[in-house]
């Protein structure tokens, strides 16, 4: 079997994403994200995208806003080998906790217009 393509590398202010797949027809996406020490994504949510994270290296702090309980703030610290599911509509921010962090993101198809920012990274 021959390789079907090359991964797409996307530079970000906070680090980088390596896109292994983003298939609209089959509704799946796979990425490796790298967040540099002291950096974070924006606080955002997706109406269509459903995500799962798997930590490869480092620690990831995921700040969640629990919208089902009066907008309660729920931070979670994840370490190597741990997973977390982010459901549609769940506000979340991804933060490198104590050094760089690298993790898999598997999800439904990624559309740029499905990222709704609540605030930019504040770190």
What are the functions of these language-model segments?
Residues 45-47, 54-55, 96-99:
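Short glycine/proline-enriched turns and hinge-like loops at secondary-structure junctions
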Residues 68-70, 93-123:
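Double-stranded beta-helix
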Residues 31-49:
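Conserved short histidine dyad/triad with adjacent acidic residue
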Residues 1-29, 40-42, 75-76, 118-123:
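A short, N-terminal "cap"/entry segment at the start of jelly-roll beta-barrel domains
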Residues 66-89:
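Short acidic-glycine-tyrosine-enriched beta hairpin
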Residues 48-67:
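Glycine- and acidic-residue-biased ligand/ion/polar-headgroup-sensing regions
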Residues 42-44, 62-64, 84-86, 91-97, ...:
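Short beta-strand His + acidic residue motifs that chelate non-heme Fe in jelly-roll/DSBH
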């Amino acid at each position: 079997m021959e390789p079907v393509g090359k991964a797409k590398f996307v530079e970000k202010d906070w680090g980088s994403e390596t896109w292994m797949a983003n298939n609209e027809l089959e509704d799946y996406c796979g990425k490796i994200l790298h967040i540099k020490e002291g950096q974070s994504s924006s606080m955002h949510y997706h109406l269509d995208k459903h995500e799962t994270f798997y930590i490869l290296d480092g620690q990831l702090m995921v700040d969640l806003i629990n919208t089902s309980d009066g907008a309660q703030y729920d931070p979670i610290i994840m370490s190597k080998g741990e997973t977390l599911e982010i459901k549609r509509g769940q506000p979340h921010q991804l933060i490198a906790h104590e050094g760089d962090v690298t993790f898999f993101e598997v999800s439904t198809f990624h559309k740029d217009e499905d990222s709704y920012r609540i605030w930019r990274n504040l770190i």
